[in-house]
Amino acid sequence: MENLNHCPLEDIKVNPWKTPQSTARVITLRVEDPNEINNLLSINEIDNPNYILQAIMLANAFQNALVPTSTDFGDALRFSMAKGLEIANTITPMGAVVSYVDQNVTQTNNQVSVMINKVLEVLKTVLGVALSGSVIDQLTAAVTNTFTNLNTQKNEAWIFWGKETANQTNYTYNVLFAIQNAQTGGVMYCVPVGFEIKVSAVKEQVLFFTIQDSASYNVNIQSLKFAQPLVSSSQYPIADLTSAINGTL
């Protein structure tokens, strides 16, 4: 499959987080308990920093949409599209779910880069008009990191390792994009994504996969795009601002 992305996979195969990131801010968020790490890797493309608190609040809200997975994954957590739709109806100020997806993507003994491109095509459909060049770069890096460079992330809060067999590794991976740019206009888009990944390889191999390696995959992708009118940080209660500063930034 041809790679149509602005940032070629070959340019980020070693460490995608070291590629140029425009105005994007990559932050790990904390939930109410300061000892608990948010299980969504939050990637924010915010043109106006006055709206960064809004991105944090949305990420914290959708943290509650992570649910236990199927039997093959043990106690692993994964963003649930169905639960996310429920959460979206409770968020204030009121927003709207613009699109959502629950889709399986598979491949048999093909390069990891092929699976990455398949997943990218699904998520580009969800993101839609918010796809400026820098957002495509961030999306490409995030999806690449979902399947490669796992040894550097194996103990991070956004990845959960499920049950293993002699020839299969199961894991979940959770990412959230918050986007406010010229394409989004007067709203912020929040796009949480949950992956259930079954790969026909032992964990020690999976941890060191590059985009040139080959493997068989069965991947379930659950995601939605939530649009909320822009909310200035000054409109949030001071307690929310203090909590964000102390527990997040």
Curated annotation (Swiss-Prot):
Write the record's keywords in alphabetical order, separated by commas.
Plasmid, Sporulation, Toxin, Virulence
Q: Does the keyword Disulfide bond apply?
A: no
Q: How is it modified after translation?
A: Active after proteolytic processing.
- InterPro entries in the cross-refs: CytB_endotoxin-like_sf, Endotoxin_CytB
Q: Which SUPFAM superfamilies match?
A: CytB endotoxin-like
- Kindly list the GO CC terms recorded for this protein: extracellular region
Molecular function via GO: toxin activity
- Biological-process GO terms, alphabetical: sporulation resulting in formation of a cellular spore
Q: Which domain of life is it from?
A: Bacteria
Role, per record = Kills the larvae of dipteran insects by making pores in the epithelial cell membrane of the insect midgut. Acts on mosquitos and black flies.
Q: Which family does it belong to?
A: Belongs to the cyt1/cyt2 endotoxin family.
| Identification of the protein by name | Type-1Aa cytolytic delta-endotoxin
Q: Which organism is it from?
A: Bacillus thuringiensis subsp. morrisoni
